[in-house]
Each structure stands twice: as C-alpha cells, then as structure tokens.
Swiss-Prot record:
Cell location: Cell membrane; Postsynaptic density membrane
Organism encoding this protein: Mus musculus
Compositional bias per record (Low complexity), positions renumbered to this chain: 276-287
Protein name (database record): Voltage-dependent calcium channel gamma-8 subunit
Alphabetical UniProt keywords: Calcium, Calcium channel, Calcium transport, Cell membrane, Ion channel, Ion transport, Lipoprotein, Membrane, Palmitate, Phosphoprotein, Postsynaptic cell membrane, Synapse, Transmembrane, Transmembrane helix, Transport, Voltage-gated channel
Residues bearing PTM Phosphoserine: S251, S254
Amino acid sequence: MESLKRWNEERGLWCEKGVQVLLTTIGAFSAFGLMTIAISTDYWLYTRALICNTTNLTAGDDGPPHRGGSGSSEKKDPGGLTHSGLWRICCLEGLKRGVCVKINHFPEDTDYDHDSAEYLLRVVRASSIFPILSAILLLLGGVCVAASRVYKSKRNIILGAGILFVAAGLSNIIGVIVYISANAGEPGPKRDEEKKNHYSYGWSFYFGGLSFILAEVIGVLAVNIYIERSREAHCQSRSDLLKAGGGAGGSGGSGPSAILRLPSYRFRYRRRSRSSSRGSSEASPSRDASPGGPGGPGFASTDISMYTLSRDPSKGSVAAGLASAGGGGSGAGVGAYGGAAGAAGGGGAGSERDRGSSAGFLTLHNAFPKEAASGVTVTVTGPPAAPAPAPAPPAPAAPAPGTLSKEAAASNTNTLNRKTTPV
C-alpha cells in the first residue's frame, strides 16, 4: 500500500485518470471534426486552370503560340485562379467566377492502361477512401473513450480506442500522400519550375494534416491510460492479497510475509535440494574391494544386480567336518564366508552347519554400505546343500581290568548252567 500511495503522489495533475480520459475524449472529437471539415470543403489546393478564362486557347491546345503582325509572340494564358478539394474545383477569377465543377479524374480523350500505376493512383484519388476511413475510425475511437468513462472496470475498451486512433492516423497520412502524388504527377505543358509556382495547398489540406497529428497523440495517450489502469489493478490485487494474508496470520496462519515470500522460498528450496544432491553424488563413500572385507572400491548400485553369490557344497562339507571334529563339545566351525561357533552336543552338527552358512551369508550381506543398500538387490543362487550324514554310533566302552563284560558274563553263566545240569 505504501508503494501505491507513493506512486500516486509522484504523478502530476495531468496523469490523473479523469483528466487523461477527458483530454483523450476532447482530442478524439477534435480530430474527427478537423477531418470532417477537410473532407467536406474545397480548399485543399490553389491552382490556375483554363476553364475560368475566355481566351482562344483550351486546356488541350499544345500547338505553337500565335504570332501577331509585328512578329511578337503571345504568351500562353495560365488560366484563372481556382481552388479545389477532393470532389470539386471552383473558379475564383474570370467569367466563371464562383462556379464549381465536379472534378473529372478520367477524361474521355485520354486512354489509360488499367494495369498502370497512374490509373490506380487516379482511382484511389477519385474515391478518397483513406480520408473517409480515417474519419470513421476517429469517430469510433471517440465513442470508445466516452464508453470507458462509464465502464471503468473494462480496461480493454480504452485499449481498443488507442488502436483505433493509431489506425486513423495512418489512414489519414496515406490519403494525404496519395493526394500529393496525384497532383505532382498530373501531365501538363508546363515545366516543373512553372508548375511549382502555380499551385499551393490550402487550409483544408492543413486541417487534414493537423487531424493526423492529433490522432496519433491521443492514440498514445489512450494506450498510456490503459497501462496505468492495468498497473493500478495489479497493485490493488496485491493489496487485497496482503489483507487476506494478514487475516490468515491473525487467525493462526503464516501472515502476509510468508505469502509474499512463497515463490522465492520455493526457488531457494529447489536450489538447496539440487546442491545437496550434487554434493552427495560427488562425495560418495568408498566401497570394499571384496564382498566380505573393507578397504577397497565398492560396486555401483546399477551393477551390483549383475553379480550372484553361490554356495559351494564342498566348502559346506569342509565346515561340517570341522564342526564335527569338535567331538560334540565346544569348537569353532569355519564356513565359506564367515566363521560360526561350534555347538555343544553330538547330534547338532547339521543344524550348526546350516547356521554357520547363513551367518556367513549375513556377514557378506552386511558388508555393503548402508547408502547403497536401498538400491542393491543381491540374489543367491546355487545347488541345494547335500543332506547331512547320520552320526556314527558311539564306540563301546572298554571293560575295566579284571572284570567281564555283560556278554562274557552271560556266556560264562550259560556254560556253567550247561555243566551243572544233571544228565
């Protein structure tokens, strides 16, 4: 709001909306009036024509001058002074003084090529389409400016008025150029120096030129009004956003400052996320050279899925043999990729071997860094493990010296019974 107030204070009185619209409206109807007067009057050009004199020479007489008895030559009569407009030519001197005649742009005794530039120029000059179009556009532009004072919310009306004023000025200047070209290109018996001294432009012509200048000025002014109204509407919407943000902040929201900083915050957050991702990609931790040990280069997350880990049954049998060598007691079982402690008990060798192999796989699996764990897929393939051999029965204990075993005692008892039985 402070910036809007400061901007309004810096503007002068001529920049006020009402003054600008009023000046544009007055200028539009003034330009339309000047162009209408220029089109309807017959004072565009002052020149001399033979239609107003009474001499024997006519406009089409190009023969040699008549000579008198004294041998002196007679000058050609330049004709009477006339003033002409877009439609008529009027005599100011001679017997036909005050008589106005319609201009004939296509004389019957002259043949014109319909494809020539002179013929097209005469058609445009005879129709006077560009001055008439300029007047119509000026009228429409003035109506649009007047309507913009009623419909102030519709800013496109004043923009359309500015475009109409600029187009009217261009149409006006094209019509003026065509008129000048048609007058300068008219054929005649006079040289260029003599023709320049025998015609001049009148006040109707200058009214048309003034209308062109005024149309361009009010066109620029109308576009300026549209720009100022658009800027004011933008500032008003910004102030409404501030008010809405202030109400949200008073009710527990983030306030207007957070709303205004939202695009820049998003930009900074995006920039920080990009820099952090770039830093993490540049400073990646080192990988191990071997699957089970640290200290070497690691695998890429995209290439780790190409490797498979297999279980070698021969290594598993070696681990089982080492585990069984413990004699059912406490021992150390060494697996293919990690060590597993030997379990107590003679009948648990197979289960201890399976646990040792799984512990070796877990040791390999945990050797990879945690950063690459999310993108790594490890597939373990290989033939199934051979079934564990049945445990050997325990050897019979040796009898103590001087004692007999149960089988020997039984045989001796049978022998004694057989000997002592009476026949």
